[in-house]
């Protein structure tokens, strides 16, 4: 099970600089 949790570089981790996604603000209603 631990091996499946590894997502590699596309994982959801908050580390270092933030990347702005285009068109993702609509999900928050902004």
Swiss-Prot record:
Q: Give tissue specificity per the record.
A: Testis.
Instruction: Decide whether keyword Protease is in the record.
Output: no
This protein's species is Octopus vulgaris
The subcellular location is: Nucleus; Chromosome
Q: Note down the stretches annotated as region Disordered.
A: 1-30
Q: What is this protein called?
A: Sperm protamine P5
User: Any idea which UniProt keywords this protein has?
Assistant: Chromosome, Developmental protein, Differentiation, DNA condensation, DNA-binding, Nucleosome core, Nucleus, Spermatogenesis
One Gene Ontology molecular-function label? DNA binding
The answer to whether the entry has keyword Nucleus is: yes
One GO process term, biological-process aspect: cell differentiation
Q: Name one GO cellular component term.
A: nucleus
What is the stated purpose of this protein?
Protamines substitute for histones in the chromatin of sperm during the haploid phase of spermatogenesis. They compact sperm DNA into a highly condensed, stable and inactive complex.
